[in-house]
C-alpha cells in the first residue's frame, strides 16, 4: 500500500532521527538568503537552518527565524493540515537551529500554484493564520500529487503582513472543516510558548478570531504589495 508524503514525514522514526540522530553536513544551499545546510541526520535527509546564520531583519526584531519555522510546523499539525514537513529545534554543528525533513525528488511547480486544489487551499489558510509574508512559488513542494509548504521564517508578525502567490481563494467562504480546525486553535500558547512572543501569540489569536467572524479567506491588501518579490 502506498504511503502519502504526509504520512512518511510524520513517522516516529523520522522524529527520533531528527531529534537524536548524528548530524553529517553534506553541503549548503547557495541560493538561500539565510544559511541553509543540507545534511543527513540519523540517516534522514534534512535542511538545517542555524540561528547563527540568520541575517538581521529590521521588521522582525524579536526571536529567531528558526523558531518561526518550528512554530509554523506546530500550527499546521494542530490544525490537522499536515502541510509542512516535520520541523524540530535542536543543537547542531553551528549552534541551535531548525531541522526540517527534506522532501526528496520534489517536482517542478510550473503553473500548478494557480490551481484551486484542496492542498493549496490548506496552505492559503495556513498562511493567513500564521501571517506569512513570503509565500513564493518556490516555497511550494509538489510530490505524488501532494503539496507541502516550506520556508516559514518570516511569519507570525504581530502586524498584518500577508504576502502570497495563493490569492485564488480570496473572499471564498470557509468550509465546515476549516471552521472546525480554527476552533481547535483557541489555546496556541500550549505549543508555541518559547517560540513566539506573547504579542505574536496574541496577534495569532486575533487573526483566528477574525477569520471565524468573517467566515472567509482574506482579500489581498491594498496598502502594500500582496505578492512577495520575486514571486519565485
Question: Where would I find each of the regions flagged by the language model?
Answer:
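Phosphate/dinucleotide-binding and metal-coordinating scaffold of catalytic cores
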Residues: 1-232
